[in-house]
């Protein structure tokens, strides 16, 4: 097994297998990234396009499904476009159209006690006090956080942003945060020796065996003493 090999041979295998491990891991996690991405698109009424992400880097574009954001029924010259939605209008837009879908009531729980020989406790979520950013509300996966972090940061500190900071700027930050995270996970699985070792350690329990010189054993397992 990998663990039984010499340190020198282990390092040779790590160098040889790093790209294969990266590809395998990112193929497994890629669908989770895409699920978070599609859910975010639906939430923000945007669509990512012409995007790519890999070990070398990432790039993306996005567009709005509906732009202008607000249409004036009387005079179209008063329509408000995403790149014009700034300041208090932007905060109100986020507060009314985004935050209700990514927040929930703050969680409260009693310390618990024995009742009828069973340990029980009471819990509830507040209908008044909201909790922001405590979990991953889009899909339940950690990648939600990287999409929503810029929005949550803006919501908490919007007064500190420039007056011309727009919805377009904010959504671009969200996509950039997300694709940067995705790219960095590629780097992690290719560059982090401890992560590669762990994968190789786990693979030995999936019948991945080696000769002493590091070559992969491909014979029948019945022949292994």
For every predicted segment, state its role.
Residues 1-225:
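Alpha-helical propensity feature that highlights long, continuous alpha-helices across diverse contexts
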């Amino acid at each position: 097994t990998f663990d039984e090999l010499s340190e020198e041979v282990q390092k040779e295998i790590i160098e040889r297998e790093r790209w294969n491990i990266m590809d395998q891991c990112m193929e497994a996690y890629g669908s989770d990234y895409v699920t978070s991405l599609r859910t975010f698109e639906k939430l923000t009424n945007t669509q990512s396009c012409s995007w790519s992400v890999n070990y070398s880097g990432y790039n993306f574009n996005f567009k709005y499904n509906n732009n202008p954001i607000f249409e004036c029924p009387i005079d179209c010259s008063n329509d408000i476009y995403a790149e014009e939605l700034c300041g208090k209008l932007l905060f109100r837009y986020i507060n009314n159209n985004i935050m209700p879908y990514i927040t929930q009531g703050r969680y409260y729980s009693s310390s618990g006690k024995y009742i009828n020989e069973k340990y029980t406790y009471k819990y509830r979520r507040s209908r008044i006090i909201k909790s922001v950013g405590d979990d991953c509300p889009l899909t339940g996966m950690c990648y939600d956080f990287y999409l929503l972090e810029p929005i949550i940061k803006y919501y908490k500190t919007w007064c500190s942003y420039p007056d011309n900071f727009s919805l377009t700027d904010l959504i671009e930050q969200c996509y950039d945060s997300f694709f940067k995270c995705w790219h960095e996970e590629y780097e992690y699985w290719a560059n982090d020796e401890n992560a590669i070792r762990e994968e190789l350690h786990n693979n030995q329990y999936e019948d991945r065996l080696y000769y002493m010189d590091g070559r992969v054993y491909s014979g029948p397992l019945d022949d292994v003493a």
